[in-house]
């Protein structure tokens, strides 16, 4: 078991900002199309984080053209260029799955005041 821990530690990224459910983030994803690569930005609300270590993932939700889109990203994935926290959300839950059923202003999250 200790051998796996040392392998996992080598794969961990150190440039991950502190974010949690309710925060609005921009995830800059490296997309490879043939021989070219480009960066695509996915901005949305983090609705949950799960796992720990190398296996940790987070789910980001946004509404695009009146259709809800959710993407799950591994936190320590080499495909992610960087993560940028846009706003901090003031929520009382670790998983915000109830946002899937809400529309319009009801799906808005209050911004945390510093």
From Swiss-Prot:
Under the cellular component aspect of Gene Ontology, which terms does the record hold? cytosolic large ribosomal subunit
> What is a biological process (GO) this protein takes part in?
translation
Database matches in SUPFAM superfamilies:
Translation proteins SH3-like domain
Keyword Ribonucleoprotein attached: yes
Any Pfam family the entry gives: Ribosomal_L19
Q: Name one GO molecular function term.
A: structural constituent of ribosome
- Give the top-rank taxon of the lineage listed in the UniProt record for this protein: Bacteria
- Which keywords annotate this record? Ribonucleoprotein, Ribosomal protein
Ribosomal protein: is it a keyword of this entry?
yes
Similarity remark: Belongs to the bacterial ribosomal protein bL19 family.
Database matches in NCBIfam families: rplS_bact
Tell me, in a sentence or two, what this protein's role is. Answer: This protein is located at the 30S-50S ribosomal subunit interface and may play a role in the structure and function of the aminoacyl-tRNA binding site.
Name of the protein in its database record: Large ribosomal subunit protein bL19
Q: Organism, per UniProt? A: Clavibacter sepedonicus
The gene that this protein is the product of is rplS
């Amino acid at each position: 078991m200790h051998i796996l821990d040392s392998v996992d530690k080598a794969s961990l990224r150190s440039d991950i900002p502190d974010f949690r459910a309710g925060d609005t983030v921009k995830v800059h994803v490296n997309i490879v199309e043939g021989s070219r690569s480009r960066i695509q930005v996915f901005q949305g609300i983090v609705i949950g984080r799960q796992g720990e270590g190398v296996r940790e993932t987070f789910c980001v939700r946004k509404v695009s053209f009146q259709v809800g889109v959710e993407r799950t990203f591994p936190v320590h994935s080499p495909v992610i260029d960087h993560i940028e926290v846009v706003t901090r959300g003031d929520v009382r839950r670790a998983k915000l799955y109830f946002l899937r059923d809400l529309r319009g202003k009801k799906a808005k999250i209050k911004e945390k005041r510093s």
